[in-house]
Amino acid sequence: MSPSVRDARNDLASLQQQAAAEAEDIRRWWSQPRWAGTKRVYTAEDIVKRRGTFPVVEYPSSVMADKLVETLARHSRNGTVSQTFGVLDPVQMTQMVKYLDTIYVSGWQCSATASTSNEPGPDLADYPMDTVPNKVEHLFMAQLFHDRKQREARLSCTTQRELDQLGPEIDYLRPIVADADTGHGGLTAVFKLTKMFIERGAAGIHMEDQSSSNKKCGHMAGRCVIPVQEHISRLVTVRMCADVMHSNLVLVARTDSEAATLLSSNIDARDHYYIVGASNPEVTVPLIEVLDAAQQAGASGDRLAQLEEDWCKKAKLRLFHEAFADQVNASPSIKDKAGVIAKFNSQIGPQTGASIREMRKLGRELLGQDVYFDWDLPRAREGLYRYKGGTQCAIMRARAFAPYADLVWFESNFPDFQQAKEFAQGVREKFPNKWMAYNLSPSFNWPKAMPPKEQENYIQRLGEIGYVWQFITLAGLHTNALAIDNFSREFSRFGMRAYAQGIQQREMDEGVDVLKHQKWAGAEYVDSILKLAQGGVSSTASMGKGVTEEQFGSSNGAKL
C-alpha cells in the first residue's frame, strides 16, 4: 500500500501522533490533585499501548470513586469518620444508606453466604474469584434501581405538599468498597479481578498482603504474609488496571503483618528484621526432618505437636537482634554489654530495612565472632519462614505500601486505641496526610474490651488521628442472625402476634419503607413504565384496584 492511500490506522506517523495525544490526556488526568500522593512505576505511553481503540468511557464505578474520594476528603478536613458495615443484600442496603455514607462488601460474608459456587465456607478466599464482584453488582444494580424508583416518584409530585409527604430525598448511590482479598492468584489474576470490580460498580477495593495460597481471615491463626515488594506489585497492578480502564478506583492497602507468624519468602531485605531463626548451635537438624522421621515412625498428631514444641524450645527461636543480644550477654569478654547491644540497635531497627548480610556484618564487628542464627532450620512443612510481626512491622509495611494506595489499614487482634495511635503516628511520620482505615471487627469481644461509654466514642477518637474510613465487616451477618433468631423464637410461641406486633407494627411506628414491600420492590415504578409503553394506560398494572397494599394507608399510626 502506497503512503498516499494508507489510512491513519495503518500509518505509523499518524498512529504515533494519536498515541502521543492520548498520552498527554492521561498525563493531564494524573496531574489532578487526586493523584498527588500516588506513585506510578510506568508512563502514560505504557497505558496507551494497553488500551484498545474503543473510545474512552467513564465507568459508573469511577463516578462513584470520585464521590468516595470527596466523602473521605470531607471527613479528613472535619476530623470526622465515614463509618459503615458489611451489607448482605439490597434490603440492608436500602435501609443503611439513610444513615451511612459508604457501603462495605465483605469477602467473609460472601464466602459464607454468597459464593458463586453455592458452596459456603469460612474466610479462606477459596471461593470463585467472581464471588465478591457479583455481590457488588447485585448491590450496585439495586442502588441504581431504587434511585430511579425514587426519582420517578418525586418528579410525579404536582404540589410541594406531595413532595414533602415523601420525606427527604434518600441518597441510594453510596460508594461501595469491596474486599479483594489477596487478588486470588498471581498478577494476571489481580488485573482481571480489578477489572471485574470496576465493571460491576465498586468505587474502591482493598487488597491484603497475605499469601493467596495460604489466605486466612484477618482474625484467624496461621497467617502468612508475602514479601513487601510482592504486595507492592499487586498494588501497582490494581492501579495499572484502573488506569487502562480510565477509572479513579480507590485502593486500600491492608497489611496482616501485625499478627503474622509466617512469611512466604525471604527475598526482600525489608522483611529480614522480622524473620525468626534458631539461635542454639547445638540444634543442627531442621524441624521438618525431625517431624518427618517421627511421622514415618507412626507418631500421632499430639506427639508431633509436642515434638515441635520441644524442638522450638531447644532451638531458642529468636529474631536476629535478639540472638545477637543473647550472645553478647553470654560473652565473658564483653564488659559493656548494654552499650554494645545499644550500638547494634542504633543501626539496626524495625524501620531500617537492613538485610541479613548487613546484620551479620555488624554483629561480627561488635561481637568479635559470627552470630549463630539459622532461619532455615525452623521453616514450616510448606517451606514458609517463621515471622514475628507486630505493630512496628505493620508500620514498616504500611509505609512501603502508602505511595501506591489511597488508604492504608493494619489488621489487629484487639480494639486497642494506643496500638492504633502508634500505627497512625508511624505512618504519618513519613506520610503526614495519609488516610487510614480501621476494621471495627465483630471478632473482637467488644463488651469485654471496653465499657459502653468508650465504645460510643471509639470511632470518633480513631477519626481524630486519621482513620477516616471505619467499618464493621460482618454487622450485616450478625444483625440478620439476631433478628431471625428472635423472630423465629417469638413466632413459634405466639404465632401471628409475633409478626403483627414485633415486625409489622414496628415497621409502621418507625417508618420503615419495606412495610409496603410491593412499593419498595418497585411495583409502582414498573407500572409507570408499562403505562408509558402503552400510551398511558395498562389493564395489567400490578398496583391497581385490588392490591392488598391499600390496607396500609396513612392510618395505623404509620409514618409512611
From Swiss-Prot:
Active site: C217 (proton acceptor)
GO MF annotations in UniProt: isocitrate lyase activity; metal ion binding; methylisocitrate lyase activity
Involved pathway(s): Carbohydrate metabolism; glyoxylate cycle; (S)-malate from isocitrate: step 1/2
Reaction it catalyzes: D-threo-isocitrate = glyoxylate + succinate; (2S,3R)-3-hydroxybutane-1,2,3-tricarboxylate = pyruvate + succinate
Keywords, sorted A to Z: Glyoxylate bypass, Glyoxysome, Lyase, Magnesium, Metal-binding, Peroxisome, Tricarboxylic acid cycle
Residues holding Mg(2+): D179
EC id: 4.1.3.1, 4.1.3.30
Quaternary context: Homotetramer.
Function according to Swiss-Prot or TrEMBL: Catalyzes the formation of succinate and glyoxylate from isocitrate, a key step of the glyoxylate cycle, which operates as an anaplerotic route for replenishing the tricarboxylic acid cycle. Required for growth on ethanol or acetate, but dispensable when fermentable carbon sources are available. Also acts on 2-methylisocitrate.
Record-stated family: Belongs to the isocitrate lyase/PEP mutase superfamily. Isocitrate lyase family.
Protein name in UniProt: Isocitrate lyase
Species per Swiss-Prot/TrEMBL record: Eremothecium gossypii (strain ATCC 10895 / CBS 109.51 / FGSC 9923 / NRRL Y-1056)
